[in-house]
Structure formats: structure tokens, C-alpha cells
From Swiss-Prot:
Name of the protein described by the UniProt record: Alcohol dehydrogenase 1C
Keyword line: Acetylation, Cytoplasm, Metal-binding, NAD, Oxidoreductase, Phosphoprotein, Zinc
Lineage: Eukaryota, Metazoa, Chordata, Craniata, Vertebrata
UniProt keyword Chloroplast present: no
Catalytic reaction equation(s): a primary alcohol + NAD(+) = an aldehyde + NADH + H(+); ethanol + NAD(+) = acetaldehyde + NADH + H(+)
Cofactor(s) it depends on: Zn(2+)
Note: There are 7 different ADH's isozymes in human: three belongs to class-I: ADH1A, ADH1B, and ADH1C, one to class-II: ADH4, one to class-III: ADH5, one to class-IV: ADH7 and one to class-V: ADH6.
Name of the encoding gene: ADH1C
Length: 375
């Protein structure tokens, strides 16, 4: 029986309040309106940013259905949708690409005005919601809410991908892989023969290591306080791995001594103010580039001495790896299918969707790189 144009009842993981587990609930998912797409989820990754919402360090309206790294199949489309059709394999995009705003028209930027990151409303782009639970409206997250068997997204927030692609792997291109790989190959534009430092060896940090290697870096120094992550980092391209706890000096001083005054490129993939500063300070004062990738807590600010930049350092930030999402995601999936990079090493656990809380426990314990939930 066709579900097109009808309300669908399905399972979703609802976060009712911060610092509480997810609750598996039956929710109602409304049909897509004009220029919207309803997707049946197949695979979804657990990302640290989702956990930042649970802990309260990343603020978004609650109750909500979180999740933003996923892949699925189009179930239905609203009036006027032209870029996807029912049956297409797709990846939802937490950074949309409307193609019309000033940012989308700028070839060097990707932070589309239609995003729900800067000032989270927890709604679709028209300001309304498509989820209810027991008659109560439930907020969206980053416009895509992938911790649900079905979700509704705007057409500018979904990309059609290769019909042969394995959704349980390419779902990582929806956030973790792209968010780490892009800062190296697209934002910093790492050069062949250069020296790089990557702070944080979770799924995104390891993807940054992969990006540095793909760009031809000669030295890739991986930094983490969890030595259990070093073997995987070396497998993916790190030439050296260091633990800040092994040194009496600040880690930036250690790195400067190792690299004749500082690295060419550094990447902070944790989201802590102290490591953001260490990442900046470890890059060469005259020619280094440092990129902020990790999401810092909403309420914290940094103060810096302007001389740190005056001497010639470049300090950048990257959302979704600097990639224009709707046009870049299909290309990244094609590159994966062409074996230009592998995602297997990033996936350490696969669980049924109902075990979402167990998946978050694995993340918090440092025992997983990426856990994939299967519907």
C-alpha cells in the first residue's frame, strides 16, 4: 500500500531533555510539502555533535529528533521537486545548498543562508515542523533529523547519489568523513611535501589525516591523549603520533621543536578552547595555516594577541569541510565507489537502531570511532 501523501507512523529516537537518554517512540511524520522530500532512512552514524546536544553544550530546541549523518531512499516528494524522485538513494545535508543566496553564489564558501546552524529554530525552512509524538510537535535538528525511520527535508538539503553505493558506508560522507577530509584538501589546501598536525583522532580527525595524506603531506603528526587511537591513525597516514600527557612542555612547544618552528598546516578536530589555541600556536608564525574543525561550546569565547596573526599565520574555520553540499556529496560518493578512499577503517561498530543509547555509550567511552545504526 502506497504511503505517498499520507502521514507515516514510525520509530524515532526522541531527546526530550538534555542529559537524558534517547527514548524510542512512535512518531507521526507528515507528508512533504512543496519543495520537500520524505526519506526512508537506512543507515545513520553517531556523531560527536549529536552528543554535544545531549550534554547541553550545543543548544537546539527540545524535544527533538537529532541525527545528521545518514543515507536513505526517497519515499515521496512534494510539489515542484525536480532533483530527486521516489526510489533514489540519497544523503541528507545538514548544510543545505540553495544555490541562490550570496554564499552559494560565492565559489569559495558553503555556509548557505538556509542553514539551521547559526540560530537553530528546530524547524523546516518554512518555520513549521513535520514530526509529532502523542499529539505533541517535535523539533527538527539541523533541518534533517535522521534518528527516525522516516524524515522530511527541504529539496536543497538532500543529494542524489550513485544507485550502487552501500548506504551503510557512504552515510559517513553526510558528516564525519567530509567534515574532516575537506579542511585538508579544500579549505587549507595542504601542499605536497608539507608538514601537518591533527588534534583529535575521532572519526573526523582520522578523516583529516586521510585528507592530509591524499594531498601529499610528507609529515602528518597526530595528537591525542588516547594512545589506543594511534595504530588506526598510522594505518590511515599519520607518520607520528604524540600524547600531550607525555610531555612537561605545552604541546605547541613540542610540535614547534619537532618541525623547525612550526607545522605548515594544523587542524583542531576536538572543539576545546585550549586545543584550538594549541593548534594555532603550533603552526609556523610566518606561513602556517590553522583550521578550526571541532565544534566548541556555544557559551565560550577566546581572547588572543593579534600579533599571533600579524606575523603571517592564517586562521580558518570549516563547516562540512568547506564542501558545497548538494554538488559535492555525489562526487565524493563517486570517488568512494572509484576506490579513491576507503571508509571501512572509520566504522568500528554496527548496531540496530533501537540500541542508539548503547552507541552513544561507545562514543563517550572512546571505544568506537564511528558507530552505524541500521534501521
Amino acid at each position: 500500500m502506497s504511503t505517498a501523501g499520507k502521514v507515516i507512523k514510525c520509530k524515532a529516537a526522541v531527546l526530550w531533555e538534555v542529559k537524558k537518554p534517547f527514548s524510542i517512540e512512535e512518531v507521526e511524520v507528515a507528508p512533504p510539502k512543496a519543495h520537500e522530500v520524505r526519506i526512508k532512512m537506512v543507515a545513520v552514524g553517531i556523531c560527536r555533535s549529536d552528543d554535544h546536544v545531549v550534554s547541553g553544550t550545543l543548544v537546539t530546541p527540545l524535544p527533538a529528533i537529532l541525527g545528521h549523518e545518514a543515507a536513505g531512499i526517497v519515499e515521496g516528494v512534494g510539489e515542484g521537486v525536480t532533483t530527486v524522485k521516489p526510489g533514489d538513494k540519497v544523503i541528507p545535508l545538514f548544510t543545505p545548498q540553495c544555490g541562490k543566496c550570496r554564499v552559494c553564489k560565492n565559489p569559495e564558501s558553503n555556509y548557505c543562508f538556509k542553514n539551521d546552524l547559526s540560530n537553530p529554530r528546530g524547524t523546516m525552512q518554512d518555520g513549521t515542523r513535520r514530526f509529532t509524538c502523542g499529539g505533541k510537535p517535535i523539533h527538527h535538528f539541523l533541518g534533517i533529523s535522521t534518528f527516525s525511520q522516516y524524515t522530511v527535508v527541504d529539496e536543497n538539503a538532500v543529494a542524489k547519489i550513485d544507485a550502487a553505493s552501500p548506504l551503510e558506508k557512504v552515510c559517513l560522507i553526510g558528516c564525519g568523513f567530509s567534515t574532516g577530509y575537506g579542511p585538508a584538501v579544500k579549505v587549507a589546501k595542504v601542499t605536497p611535501g608539507s608538514t601537518c598536525a591533527v588534534f583529535g583522532l575521532g572519526g573526523v580527525g582520522l578523516s583529516a589525516v586521510m585528507g592530509c595524506k591524499a594531498a601529499g603531506a610528507a609529515r602528518i603528526i597526530a595528537v591525542d591523549i588516547n594512545k589506543d587511537k594511534f595504530a588506526k591513525a598510522k594505518e590511515l597516514g599519520a607518520t607520528e603520533c604524540i600524547n600531550p600527557q607525555d610531555y612537561k612542555k605545552p604541546i605547541q612547544e613540542v610540535l614547534k621543536e619537532m618541525t623547525d618552528g612550526g607545522v605548515d598546516f594544523s587542524f583542531e578536530v576536538i572543539g576545546r578552547l585550549d586545543t584550538i589555541m594549541a593548534s594555532l600556536l603550533c603552526c609556523h608564525e610566518a606561513c602556517g595555516t590553522s583550521v578550526i574543525v571541532g565544534v566548541p561550546p556555544d557559551s565560550q569565547n577566546l581572547s588572543i594577541n593579534p600579533v599571533l596573526l600579524l606575523t603571517g599565520r592564517t586562521w580558518k574555520g570549516a563547516i562540512f569541510g568547506g564542501f558545497k553540499s548538494k554538488e559535492s556529496v555525489p562526487k565524493l560518493v563517486s570517488d568512494f565507489m572509484a576506490k579513491k578512499f576507503s571508509l571501512d577503517a572509520l566504522i568500528t561498530n554496527v548496531l540496530p537502531f533501537e540500541k542508539i543509547n548503547e552507541g552513544f555509550d561507545l562514543l563517550r567511552s572512546g571505544k568506537s570511532i564511528r558507530t552505524i545504526l541500521m534501521f
